UniProtKB/Swiss-Prot annotation:
PANTHER family: ARGININE--TRNA LIGASE, CYTOPLASMIC, ARGINYL-TRNA SYNTHETASE. One of its GO terms (molecular function) is ATP binding. Its EC number is 6.1.1.19. This is Arginine--tRNA ligase. The keyword ATP-binding applies. Monomer. The keyword Signal does not apply. It comes from Rickettsia felis (strain ATCC VR-1525 / URRWXCal2) (Rickettsia azadi). Its main location: cytoplasm. Keywords: Aminoacyl-tRNA synthetase, ATP-binding, Cytoplasm, Ligase, Nucleotide-binding, Protein biosynthesis.
Length: 576
């Protein structure tokens, strides 16, 4: 029995019985109180009902208490504060969750969630102008793990990478590759400021020289540009795909911005929005305060972004008449919706925080308020090596690439460490600490817990083979897991699916990492108690019954840690 789900269903049933309203009960929370004296679980249902019925929350809470006290898994119910209902669960109900994990694993990990959403999540979308730098890794890991979580709870998810292959940076890439091509033909070249001086483009010039000889030099400029652009973008995308694959990240779709231009999708989207009365000709208001020298007060085509909460309307054309980047964003969002997505998630870097309102406006307009949109910002990673910050710049050619860091510490460490802070908070990534074998290193601490659980089972198999066979056959008495430490660990194990569900609901993958660190900490504490007091050891040859129960506990811990690591794309370690 999943205690969290069971209590939620019983609260819904009580709401229907008492107030003939089960829909409102679906919005109630079932949480774990921060303080044990407030019980095991707590709900705000009384305050929700009270607001709806215009009655006292405590009066509502008392009625719920009267109905729910009779439930077989409830030990006691207390009313606290303005009307919180605090539940203490019987120990045997918590203990039974161990059996559910071990014997009904698939059912225990199943989450009953709305599966009608077809989610498109766009993340990374780095310009294809060079190897990915470590700054992109946070958004890449966040987006990938969020997608995995959403898939885990049952949503249909498309993982997408938007290829910015139609902007000025691509023109700079082409110019740089052409210089490297001429260099490969024997010319002495200098890479001007503003282009890409990194040596990673030298092989591209050599390939072009080998394939074309000097033909590109005499070719029509437009034809030459097209050939070099297609070649360079594809090579850089191959590089980015490999960098991502080495991090365990694979997108379903790489979508070309250029294709929106080539297929006339921008024109089609503008025509649609014009018909909706959302495109007009006008001038943008001057920036507040001192007039910015780049402010353009010309009459131009604008999208009524302010209709949907944006701070200003947005230009869809540049001064030269070409489509703006925003116009591409309009067409791209429409394309996603036309493909069947009814929930768009954008994962952006800290430098794009100003895009949140405009993206929300785009989706609200094109989705006609029927398509959900969430824009998640990943703050900067402060990458440190031996206490010295590493500057990251493709243009300067001295960035720390994903490949560099992956080679140094491995994908599992990168993936886990990128989740050790909430995505909208800056993250310090210390190369020294992530390689330490100590409790100060969270990935080591969690992996070590997994290894220890396996060693417990191996030790029992070796020292107590008959008892181990009984354990595998499910012959254990879980009521023996009665110490405070054991019950607290069991409560935490029982909350695993609740944590997973919350991670999906709030788009917060870091909750998984935090949960695993907490579980590992509690397990290691109990392990250390066993060093001081043999009664706390997991394998006690003189007490077969208690050993059987603790083998079940160790196995449940192992399964939940493995499940958590699998969700975030980290390989559980069997030995260290």
């Amino acid at each position: 029995m999943n205690i969290f789900n069971q209590l939620k269903q019983d609260i819904i049933a009580a709401s229907k019985q008492l107030y003939n309203n089960q829909e409102i009960a679906n919005t109630a929370n079932i949480e774990t109180p921060k303080d044990n004296f407030n019980g095991d679980l707590s709900s705000n249902i009384a305050m929700i009902i009270a607001a709806k019925e215009s009655i006292s929350p405590r009066e509502v809470a008392l009625k719920f208490k009267e109905v729910l006290t009779t439930l077989p898994y409830i030990a006691s119910i207390e009313i606290a504060g303005p009307g919180f209902i605090n539940f203490t669960i019987k120990a045997e109900s918590w203990q039974a969750s161990i059996k559910d994990i071990l014997q009904h694993e698939e059912k225990f990990f199943e989450i009953d969630i709305d599966k009608s959403r077809n989610i498109n999540i766009e993340y990374v979308s780095a310009n294809p102008t060079g190897p990915m730098h470590i700054g992109h890794a946070r958004g890449a890991v966040y987006g990938d793990v969020l997608a995995r979580i959403l898939q885990k709870v049952g949503y249909s998810v498309t993982k997408e990478y938007y290829v910015n292959d139609a902007g000025s940076q691509i023109n700079d890439l082409v110019s740089t590759v052409l210089l490297r091509y001429r260099e490969a033909l024997g010319e002495k070249i200098t890479i001007p400021a503003g282009l890409y001086p990194g040596e990673y483009l030298i092989p591209l010039g050599q390939i072009l020289a080998k394939e074309y000889g000097n033909k590109l030099l005499t070719m029509n400029e437009n034809e030459r540009f097209k050939i070099v652009k297609n070649f360079a973008v594809e090579k850089m995308l191959d590089l980015n795909r490999k960098d991502l694959a080495d991090l365990g990240i694979k997108h379903d779709i790489f979508f070309s911005e250029q294709s929106l231009h080539d297929k006339g999708e921008i024109e089609g989207t503008v025509k649609l929005l014009t018909g909706m009365g959302l495109i007009y000709e006008g001038t943008l208001p001057a920036p507040k305060g001192k007039v910015h020298e780049e402010w353009d007060n010309r009459v131009q085509k604008l999208f009524k972004s302010t209709n949907y909460g944006d701070s200003q309307d947005r230009p869809i054309e540049k001064a030269d008449g070409s489509w703006s980047y925003f116009a591409s964003d309009l067409a791209y969002a429409k394309d996603k919706i036309d493909r069947g997505a009814n929930h768009l998630i954008y994962v952006l870097g800290a430098d794009h925080s100003g895009y949140v309102k405009r993206i929300e406006a785009i989706v609200k307009a094109l989705g006609k308020e029927q398509v959900k949109v969430d824009v998640k910002i990943c703050q900067l990673v402060n990458f440190v090596e031996n206490g010295v910050p590493v500057k990251m710049s493709k243009r300067l050619g001295n960035f720390a690439s994903v490949q560099d860091v992956n080679h140094e510490v491995g994908k599992d460490i990168i993936r886990f460490m990128m989740l050790t802070r909430q995505n909208d908070k800056p993250l310090d990534f210390d190369l020294v600490k992530v390689k330490e074998q100590s409790r100060e290193n969270p990935i080591f601490y969690v992996q070590y817990a997994h290894v220890r659980t396996i060693s417990i089972l191996s030790k029992a198999r070796e020292l107590m083979p008959e008892s181990y066979n009984n354990f595998e056959e499910g012959k254990y008495d879980l009521s023996l897991l009665s110490s405070e430490e054991e019950i607290e660990i069991i409560k935490l194990l029982a909350s695993w699916t609740k944590t997973l569900e919350a991670s999906a609901k709030y788009f917060e993958p870091h909750r998984i990492a935090f949960y695993l660190i907490n579980l590992a900490s509690r397990f290691h504490s109990m392990w250390n108690f066993g060093k001081e007091n043999s009664d706390y050891r997991f394998v006690i040859e003189s007490n077969k019954e208690l050993t059987l129960a603790r083998l079940a506990l160790a196995s449940a811990i192992q399964k939940v840690i493995a499940s958590g690591l699998e969700v975030i794309g980290v390989e559980p370690m069997d030995r260290m």
